[in-house]
């Protein structure tokens, strides 16, 4: 990763003792939109997830620790269409691990970024192959995850079980309808892909999808909000 993570933090959480490196915290604060308290908190979360900095923060360990980010003011990302993509977005050097700088810089956009920065990050989430455009298949995949996360949240909220096959089939159908609608109105040159500006236009006019279950409703944003 090539990133200096500083000395091991000194914390008493869970019996672990980490020594906080205030110089590193200051550096992270100055290079992101976080204040000192927020940068320190995320510094601690990172070291908790990486076993005190002794183990690389890989995809599995990152996903297991998503709920810890709620204490930092982030929403429940493990129940969102972006949970699986967030690791890829933070891993900017594509070495299949997330270092401290990548971790906090990426979360800085999610927590404190401008609307434009969040839209750009959302575009990258949809652009699964990273070629700078979104295909109908990529758009449909992310829309399907949005529907699935909405229905899962409703199922938990209402204590009603949802058949997995029915959920997948319905979510796939709705995602295809939304993707077809987006490309029909935005892909005017018929090249089968959306640019960032075209995606932005759609996201601003259709900021969410709404899942319904026996009278209950759940809105799911289609971008980082």
UniProtKB/Swiss-Prot annotation:
GO biological process: regulation of signal transduction
One MF term in the entry's GO annotations: calcium ion binding
Binding sites annotated in the UniProt record for Ca(2+) 2: 127, 129, 131, 133, 138
Keywords, ordered alphabetically: Calcium, Lipoprotein, Metal-binding, Myristate, Repeat
Protein name stated in the entry: Recoverin family protein DDB_G0274781
The keyword Membrane is assigned to this record: no
Organism: Dictyostelium discoideum
Residue sites binding Ca(2+) 3 per the record: 187, 189, 191, 193, 198
Miscellaneous comment in the UniProt entry for this protein: Probably binds two or three calcium ions.
Alphabetized InterPro entries for the sequence: EF-hand-dom_pair, EF_Hand_1_Ca_BS, EF_hand_dom, Recoverin
Entry-linked PROSITE patterns: EF_HAND_1, EF_HAND_2
Lipid tethering residues (N-myristoyl glycine): 2
